[in-house]
Amino acid sequence: MNKNSSQHSFLRTIILVSTFGGLLFGYDTGVINGALPFMAEADQLNLTALTEGMVASSLLLGAAIGAVFGGRLSDYNGRRKNILILAVLFFAATLGCTLAPNVSVMVISRFLLGLAVGGASVTVPAYLAEMSPAESRGRMVTQNELMIVTGQLLAFTCNAVIGNVLGDTSHAWRYMLVIAALPAVFLFFGMLKVPESPRWLVSKGRKEDALHVLRRIRNEEKAKSELAEVESAFHKEAEMEQAAFKDLAVPWVRRIVFIGIGIAVVQQLTGVNSIMYYGTQILKDAGFETKAALIGNIANGVISVLATFVGIWLLGKVGRRPMLMTGLIGTTAVLLLIGVLSVVLKGSPALPYVVLSLTVTFLAFQQGAVSPVTWLMLSEIFPLRLRGLGMGVTVFCLWIVNFLVGFTFPVLLANIGLSATFFIFVLLGIASVIFVKRFLPETKGLSLEQLEQNFRAYEKTDRNSAEAKVSG
């Protein structure tokens, strides 16, 4: 094996191992959909509507907090060490959920699981972005998105299989939940074999260690030039002293934070998680029987995985802006069709099949365009010293909106119906398209350090034009 192929092979190992954090993210957010009905039984946790909501949403609340603290901890401990800690937390919280004797233990365990999910949603993309060469960063970072949707598909499939095979066993939900312990073990032992991010090593003054890591994943010339680029960017950022929340108020950084929060919120306002969490309920409302709805939900998981493959391929060919715009226009148009046809075809035997085909189309746009661009851009727009903190803040906003969508969707569905609920998401989708068109910069093909220079230059241009207007 020559040196180049050895470097590529090691880079592939790094991607595979670290993205098991994404697999856990996907499985743990998707599994609750099928586990709740079994968990709610009188001889199990005997859930009421309120406690059911608490069990489902406690993970999302934990994820919001985990995103903020996970970002700060990854800046302090390093990306690799942070992922190792998260793997232990994934494992312990999974066992807590699996063995929960009552609602209180379940809610606390789900909250702890959420901390791990939120921490992984920040740390893994940042680690991948910092290990990636600029020309293939898009494909590498979105491997994590692929693992997230694979985890969700795995959850939907396991729910269906266990629900049918062990459906008469009241503790079937415990088998659904415990499966997540296996990838947590793989993540922990796998991360022991991969190196720390060279960019983080530079930030801690460990230049020789950083060069050693870069030589394992780049050729000699690229390793040295990339190290020089990283050092140059870090020295510029060092003027800001230690990263703190007040640094996010620096004008050029404030613009990045605004764009980052906007991207995160836009990704959730499509309503994607209303389908991922309540897909079975949507299909039942459209007219399917429960078993048919469960099978339909697997179709949603399959299309998510296939579309993510397409999205990863597209990121190497198409700019971030046009890809996100196309995805948002597509999701908004599909939701409009669901809203209209749910009224026009109400009571028709064709309606459930129409709604299923439209949810599949919606997820093709979402997972093939919107989600890959979201996670990639969040990982690449922030400067090195603020990357963990910046991603933490933006992903915190993503999880809070996720929590609000997940919490309000079933309430809206029960009170105003399927059509009106989706019309609300259509209006939010139109607002999202306007935001992207107005504010989103193109980042394709630029190194992380070049992106930072562009943001700094934008601030100078903005300031100069403002001064010219005043003097004029």
Locate the predicted segments by residue.
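Alpha-helical transmembrane bundle of multi-pass membrane proteins
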Residues: 1-215, 237-472
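Short helix/loop segments within enzyme catalytic domains
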Residues: 217-219
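Short, well-structured alpha-helical segments
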Residues: 223-235, 358
